Curated annotation (Swiss-Prot):
GO terms for cellular component: mitochondrial matrix; mitochondrion. Its main location: mitochondrion. Homodimer. Gene3D superfamilies: 1.10.287.1970, Aspartate Aminotransferase, domain 1, Type I PLP-dependent aspartate aminotransferase-like (Major domain). The gene is ALT1. GO terms for molecular function: L-alanine:2-oxoglutarate aminotransferase activity; pyridoxal phosphate binding. Present with 9960 molecules/cell in log phase SD medium. Keywords: Aminotransferase, Mitochondrion, Phosphoprotein, Pyridoxal phosphate, Transferase, Transit peptide. This is Alanine aminotransferase, mitochondrial. Its EC number is 2.6.1.2. Belongs to the class-I pyridoxal-phosphate-dependent aminotransferase family. Alanine aminotransferase subfamily. Pathway: Amino-acid degradation; L-alanine degradation via transaminase pathway; pyruvate from L-alanine: step 1/1. It comes from Saccharomyces cerevisiae (strain ATCC 204508 / S288c). It is an enzyme of class 2 (transferase).
Amino acid sequence: MLSLSAKNHFTVSNSITHVIKSYHIRTLTSSAEKMPHITTPFSTSASSTKLKAFRKVRPVLQRHSSSWIVAQNHRRSLSGQSSLNDLRHLNRFPHHTLKTSNNEFYPAEQLTLEDVNENVLKAKYAVRGAIPMRAEELKAQLEKDPQSLPFDRIINANIGNPQQLQQKPLTYYRQVLSLLQYPELLNQNEQQLVDSKLFKLDAIKRAKSLMEDIGGSVGAYSSSQGVEGIRKSVAEFITKRDEGEISYPEDIFLTAGASAAVNYLLSIFCRGPETGVLIPIPQYPLYTATLALNNSQALPYYLDENSGWSTNPEEIETVVKEAIQNEIKPTVLVVINPGNPTGAVLSPESIAQIFEVAAKYGTVVIADEVYQENIFPGTKFHSMKKILRHLQREHPGKFDNVQLASLHSTSKGVSGECGQRGGYMELTGFSHEMRQVILKLASISLCPVVTGQALVDLMVRPPVEGEESFESDQAERNSIHEKLITRAMTLYETFNSLEGIECQKPQGAMYLFPKIDLPFKAVQEARHLELTPDEFYCKKLLESTGICTVPGSGFGQEPGTYHLRTTFLAPGLEWIKKWESFHKEFFDQYRD
């Protein structure tokens, strides 16, 4: 048992009481009431003021836990209470572990937010932020009481998640995946499988070919860089897409979606606060969140909304120079093409100008090209890899040191297989040593999801003319694409017909990012509620119609402007009419 002379008991205890009495309390918050069950050195009749004062200074006292224990034990022994039972919260450090004479110990306090990596707490991801969280609450409310809200369902226009919004999976994809997941079917007679009308012959043959490449089972780890046969398919796809610019399988890394590739690259090139990454504003929040986790600086460059969200190379170079002056090394330049959330598509000239800056300052370029299949009529996608190769031939030596990482994913396009986590990155201009570093990082996760890798193969090598699935596969793809374009243009035209909204014409991707000139009264009420004005609008929209969007502040925007991001994935057009009605009522309510 713990022991100390009665004199020392009183001395320590009185000293603590003196500290508490002399502590000047200005404000008390609910955080001071974290552990109301803890007995204090005061008697049960102690005043509320003393109790609050004690809780305010408790962290200071606990740094001298031996004195605290003595004082606590003395007070409790006088009242006949247990000396140690409620002192477990003090055991935060090994050298303060409380033990009895028979070497028993009292369990330490659980870790709290104070123990969490600060970088994790700083990271924010608006796509699943406050508004989507509120949407989940309303969804739960509807399930309990369908009549309790002025709408009957939540429309998740906040995230590019096609199959959540009733986009059907491509039949060919799912036939092949089904056979890979249950390979016993592949041992049956092919004609019997075809006669079952569940599988077409080309899907059966493709599954057998993939199974051979994979090594016999999708349940086994693959190599960390990905299945070699699938990487060969990706290289062939890129070579064809880029009109003969050769791609090599050894430069391909299969990944668990494009997000995994972003994590790899930023983990490697972010070395702390002295390094910075150039990101477009508005941007996809994955980048700022990952930078926060890596304790590195975001170096924002603003896209020009008035010219269709174009990229200004002079703006990028200005940001680079300012970073260098502030002793921050710009290591990476992020380009999202087609844009998220803007939907803009870069011209070859704009891409060439970006490479001028990258070559001049030695920044790695991340080309986030996951929406390359989501291209609207009248627009053409040009990969950054293709433009770089052209520049290298036209200007020998000038662009030879440029390092480019190009990303693609099965989550977007007409595939929409977000939950399957398939993707790849192609490295251009990286040395063997740099590729080995990336491979080491990939190896920590062992390998990407093998069925996701198979989906990558299906994405880059769909059925071709003459195969049994070709016509039906083309029909499904065309239907998905046409419906997306119809909804996008309807929403775009609706926005531009409404008071206070201006929206750039979409060129690609699956989002619109309209600017909203909110009435002064709405801005004032938002501030009163401690919300950003665009968050206030999105919250009102959600609670009135069930349409969930993302405030523009989550993506970054020019100071003094307000935007929101919405997808146009939700089926039908009825929800667009509901939005139109809400907007008119909102402006009538808050009109200046």
